């Protein structure tokens, strides 16, 4: 049945129609705008020696892309699973990624580099351009760009003036609305103001209380200023503010097949970012730029950590984080044989976090009392209170500085590139673990002793990281429509601290007080090392038939050292731990094709293949050599066909059908569980009249059943099901001032 639906929808696209307007290529962007990738690519739209996917405004609207998750599978070997809440911005590229703590892919929005991936997932209206650079970008962009960089640019008030409005409604009472005003105060000064709101009631139900999980309400605003003070100086500022409130987590027990848990779950986030970019041409040969940013993140994640109907324990993680970044960049403006770019970068991030775990009655009975009494039944214990708190407070200041440079030398048809970055980072953890409770020991039914438990432990840990991050590339451009490249780059993801293990540390210390178990050595488990990789890559960018057929192809091999992996400790523990695998090898390829067979029809397709395996990883209990790296798909696939019909007068109709494919995805290091390859079908029809658009759309039209996430808690297994069939309507209004 699914195959029939695919065939019918694909055939519908190829019906007869009038001419399609010229496809809006992704590089249709005001080149004079001050934009971070262009600054560091010596003014080019994108560097030649990189595998990159660029999505413009029109393609983003066709695919209804509003956030990073919309790029998943559209970009080859780029996967962002949609699970949990918006704090879980896990991104996997070419077999590598990160589920918690440090990001593996960098993100900049209007030149603001985000320091915490917990803030990555938010809706972005008025997108002009989305760039995904795959492979390490650490030489120019530094820490946490080991797998790549995402750069998003929104509309400038100097390039467009008017009012833009959008309203959307879909399945599960999902809605999205935004309105933007763009105005020129003068020919050189422009302002824009954007307000947006979105929400959903969620697609799944908690059978314990009959309530929907995944309910969301989000409100945001953006104010952007663009000032061209002179022909040599430009100043841009982008301010963004967002407030998010989400409920629940649709995690389904593998044993029962049900979403059923008793405690409250929610995620709340307040986010502010501001970025000021100044660019000055100090001569006809040299340009200098300054990119300054501030970001504030206040959030609270509270969840039923056991995700069962019983009252085991709950976890809260509440952060108060702020950060500053400063990037000074100088680059050559001449078009001679030698071009160069160099700079100094610094950042400071301060995080105050509270992460208490609260034990409930069932948790006390099962995890503590039963465990203790089994070892000494003659003297059983009973906890004095049926609820108590394991408190963990952290202060984590982190700062870093870096100096970097890169030069390109053109010799005939060849361009030789060499770059180097020296990156230093210092991170400190100050922790305070506390617990104030007690228990009573009985013997022959009588009180034998009362034992108070008063834990008050403070400590301080410091980690220094110093890295040299080189890059070497050679590009061959025998013609304007062909360029081939080979590159060798080093990627880097910063190390950090295992804050989520401190609840286990306290739990084990409690057991140790009662004479059972062994206490953790905090010094040994508190930190994890940086992740480093050597990336070997070859690729080509090919334009054929007067740019009616555009192809990008790349092959890569990655030698990753100390890969950071999230592990679930054995036993009835409450936390997760980040550990370093010894060595991982990943190789594969990517193919992107875009073409216009006729002026009516636009076809796009991407495919990514990754073979990522542990080359050396032994966790002390098992040897995982040769096993696939979990959570990263081995294949991504995207196919799209867009057909346009010019109707009478100012009316037009665009028909779009697309499909995505993902998998195989292994769920654990031993590769005993996996999600098979799956595909989803989407389609839209957009009716346009002058400044007005009406779009009908649907996703997962074949109602494909698949899982997006797997984890264990207290030896219990859980999965999250992917979103079911969804459909909706979107209205856009773009009124441009004359």
Predicted regions: what they are:
Residues 277-303, 483-489, 507-580, 585-587, ...:
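Membrane-embedded beta-barrel scaffold of Gram-negative outer-membrane proteins
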Residues 341, 410-413, 424, 548-560, ...:
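Gram-negative outer-membrane beta-barrel transporters
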Residues 162-164, 169-200, 204, 208-246, ...:
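Transmembrane beta-barrel wall of Gram-negative outer-membrane proteins
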Residues 110-136:
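Short acidic/polar hinge/loop motifs at secondary-structure boundaries
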Residues 20-61:
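Short, acidic, small-residue-rich periplasmic hinge/interaction motif at the N-terminus
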Residues 68-71, 90-95, 108, 129-132, ...:
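N-terminal periplasmic accessory domains that precede
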Residues 52, 69-112:
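Extracytoplasmic beta-strand/coil segments of soluble accessory domains associated
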Residues 318-331, 335-343, 486, 627-738:
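Conserved C-terminal beta-signal and adjacent last beta-strands/turns
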């Amino acid at each position: 049945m699914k195959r029939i639906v695919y065939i019918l929808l694909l055939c519908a696209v190829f019906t007869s129609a009038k001419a399609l307007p010229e496809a809006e290529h992704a590089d249709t962007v005001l080149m004079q705008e001050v934009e971070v990738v262009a600054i560091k690519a010596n003014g080019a739209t994108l560097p030649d020696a990189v595998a990159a996917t660029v999505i413009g405004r029109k393609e983003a609207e066709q695919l209804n892309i509003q956030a990073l998750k919309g790029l998943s599978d559209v970009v080859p070997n780029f996967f962002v699973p949609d699970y949990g809440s918006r704090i879980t911005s896990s991104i996997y590229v070419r077999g590598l990624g990160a589920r918690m703590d440090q990001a593996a892919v960098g993100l900049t929005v209007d030149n603001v580099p985000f320091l915490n991936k917990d803030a990555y997932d938010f809706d972005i209206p008025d997108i002009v351009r989305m760039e995904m650079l795959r492979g390490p970008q650490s030489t120019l962009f530094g820490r946490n760009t080991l797998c790549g960089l995402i750069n998003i640019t929104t509309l400038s008030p100097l390039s467009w003036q008017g009012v833009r409005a959008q309203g959307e409604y879909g399945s599960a009472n999902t809605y999205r609305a935004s309105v933007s005003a763009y105005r020129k105060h003068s020919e050189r000064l422009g302002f824009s103001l954007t307000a947006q709101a979105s929400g959903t009631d969620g697609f799944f139900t908690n059978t314990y209380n009959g309530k929907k999980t995944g309910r969301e309400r989000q409100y945001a605003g953006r104010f952007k200023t663009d000032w061209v003070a002179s022909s040599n100086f430009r100043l841009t500022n982008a301010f963004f503010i967002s407030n998010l409130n989400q409920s629940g987590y649709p995690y389904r027990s593998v044993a029962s097949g049900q979403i059923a848990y008793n405690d409250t779950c929610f995620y709340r986030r307040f986010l502010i970012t501001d970025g000021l970019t100044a660019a000055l041409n100090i001569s006809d040969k040299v340009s200098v730029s300054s990119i300054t940013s501030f970001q504030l993140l206040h959030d609270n994640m509270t969840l039923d950590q056991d995700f069962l109907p019983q009252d085991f324990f709950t976890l809260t993680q509440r952060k108060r984080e702020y950060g500053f970044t400063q990037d000074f960049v100088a680059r050559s403006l001449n078009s001679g044989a030698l071009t160069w770019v160099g700079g100094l970068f610094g950042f400071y991030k301060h995080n105050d976090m509270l992460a208490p775990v609260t034990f409930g009655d069932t948790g006390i009975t099962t995890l503590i009392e039963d465990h203790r009494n089994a070892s000494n039944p003659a003297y059983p214990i009973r906890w004095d209170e049926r609820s108590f708190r394991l408190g963990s407070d952290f202060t984590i200041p982190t700062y870093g500085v870096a100096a970097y440079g890169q030069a390109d030398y053109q010799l005939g048809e060849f361009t030789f590139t060499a770059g180097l970055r020296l990156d230093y980072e210092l991170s400190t953890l100050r922790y305070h673990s506390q617990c104030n409770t007690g228990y009573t020991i009985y013997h022959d039914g009588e009180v034998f002793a009362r034992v108070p438990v008063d834990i008050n432990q403070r400590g301080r840990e410091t980690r220094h990281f110093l890295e040299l991050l080189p890059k070497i590339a050679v590009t061959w451009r025998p013609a304007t429509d062909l360029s081939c490249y080979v590159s060798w780059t080093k990627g880097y993801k910063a190390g950090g601290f295992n804050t989520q293990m401190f609840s286990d540390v306290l739990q084990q210390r409690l057991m140790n007080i009662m004479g059972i178990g062994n206490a953790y050595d905090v010094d040994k488990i508190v930190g994890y090392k940086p992740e480093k990789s050597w990336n070997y890559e070859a690729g080509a960018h090919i334009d054929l038939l007067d740019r009616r057929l555009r192809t990008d192809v790349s092959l890569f091999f990655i030698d990753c050292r100390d890969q950071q992996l999230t592990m679930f400790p054995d036993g009835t523990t409450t936390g997760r731990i980040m550990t370093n695998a010894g060595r991982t090898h990943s190789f594969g390829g990517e193919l992107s094709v875009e073409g216009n067979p006729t002026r009516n029809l636009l076809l796009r397709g991407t495919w990514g293949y990754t073979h990522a395996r542990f080359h050396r990883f032994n966790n002390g209990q098992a040897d995982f050599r040769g096993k696939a790296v979990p959570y990263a798909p081995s294949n991504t696939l995207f196919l799209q066909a867009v057909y346009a019909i010019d109707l009478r007068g100012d009316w037009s109709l665009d028909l779009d059908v697309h499909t995505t494919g993902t998998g195989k995805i292994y769920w654990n290091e031993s590769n005993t569980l996996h999600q098979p390859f799956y595909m989803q079908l989407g389609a839209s029809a957009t009716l346009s009249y002058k400044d007005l658009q009406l779009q009908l759309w649907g996703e997962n039209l074949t109602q494909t059943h698949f899982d997006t996430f797997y984890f264990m808690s207290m030896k219990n297994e859980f999965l999250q099901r992917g979103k079911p069939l969804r459909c909706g309507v979107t209205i856009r209004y773009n009124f441009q001032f004359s």
